[in-house]
Amino acid sequence: MKNKSNQGQAILLAALLLGGATSCFDDSYDLNKDIDMTINVGGENLAFPVGNTEKVTLDKIIEIEEGDDLQTDASGAYHLLKSGKIDDVNTRVEPVTVQATDTEIDPIEVANESDFEAAGSLEISTEREQNKEIETHAENVDEAVKEIYKLTPNTTPINIILTKEGNIDLKTLNAKVTITFSPVLEIKEATEGNKVIFNLTKEDLRNGDFTYTVHLTNITFGDGTKGNGRVIGDDRRVDISENVTVSIKADIVANEIPAGGTLTLTPTIHIGEMEVVQVEGIIDPTLDESTSSMELTGLPDFLENDETKLDIANPIFTFHANNPLNTPVEITGILSGSKNGQPIEGSEVAIGSGATDPIILQPGDNTIALSRLGEGGPEGAVNIEVSDINNLIQTIPDVVNVSIQPSVNSQEYYTVDLDKTYTVACDYDIDIPLAFGANLNIVYEETIEDLGGDLEDVDFSKAVLSASVDNTIPLALTLPDENVEVLDANGQKIEGIQVKVTGNIAAGNGTEQPVTSKLDIQLETTQPGTLNQLDAIKLKIVAASGGKEGLQLYDTQWLQLKDIKLKVPNGVKVDLN
């Protein structure tokens, strides 16, 4: 960005009309030798009217180039704008494997000699059952998992194997087999009560055994109420021990019953190794800290001056983040500024963690707007008041550093896919509207050059530059005496010149109706030949809000100097020798 200033030109016109009646002089008189041609012009009322300047609008003072961070919106309002991406935050929960298990249940004696004797027939009906605990476990459960409500494996087959034994000569067998699993083991094919029911015939057992396959879909602990899940201890192990009952209701017709004859079926429940793909429970994954930096470039000189102290009415830092987890993520962090590679003292601003309202990313897309007033964010944003956020930009940094630490603090159950990287993606928009508060202090330095001209032939001890100033810019401009330096052609300060500035430029109202002020800059010396060394004036102009807090800067606001006069109260001495 470049700044334009109208270079003041020192106009000292000695309109010296020396009468042409040379015939009144003796032709033999040597003017160059015998007469001192140093004369005094103007007395005490010498004044040179300079006139008026054109209206100087802010867009002439602040020239914006494409790509600069300072831009104007459609209305012409100045905004310091910056967009970019913050480093992604990643997390994952490592996979869990539940070990394979074979549970052999005690043999079920479906029929024996006594059953037939009691019936007095070769045709009987019986009902028998056995039960046992299915035991397995998982080790090395990820540290993030605090309590498990549900484990979801890849669909895992459960083989129910019935092995026939005994010496009863069967004519027919029609059996109804009911396997009742614990509600912890959710079976895809189960009916109400988590029962698996199938029929078994003599033909099914012709090879001595029969296998019926069902599928395990979930291992569910508790009743879904927080605290009723399986809490994981320091050993990071989950032990599963759940009851299974096998009931066989059989209709049997025998050809013959040998002495001591029996028919037994031995159930074996085989569950293969399970790769758990999803966990539901209380899960506290570790989320990486994210540190990023944003560079502010192409700023005008008055913003980059080390003495400038900004007081922005409502700067807004907007963050857009996608939370891929099925639970809220809380954000805490530090924003800070640095300049020329060094931290700016006092620029740190804490967010979240008690410093502000909690900053919560709900599952899915989020827009969080951090601002001084807690308002003004884009539509749909959650506005968070950060009352001290101006500290970050009070001294305008060339780099804004962002350090954020996401965390999951939920004590509610939610679901996480295992062996999957979750990425919290985040980008930002900075919008600093140039509407200032009461503590604004902008310092703008400008040098008005090439004022010397032919001043070596003119000697004067006092000069006053006076003007009437119309201002619509909502900034009050002051020029303290000590902020005016008179320089010679070598750029060195000329000593012995006293500067007195009378009046200030009052702030405009931000409307087209100007506020008018009077301004005098007086230069005076007691040392002859001093002021005529003047070649440049260096000004350090201080801008403040001037009681117009919150008014926005627009590129159409303007300032105009009228009735400009250069007064030389004691006249000038012109050397015509």
Model-identified regions with their sequence ranges:
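Bacterial N-terminal signal peptides that target proteins for export
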Residues: 2-11
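Short, well-ordered helical secondary-structure segments
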Residues: 11-12, 553
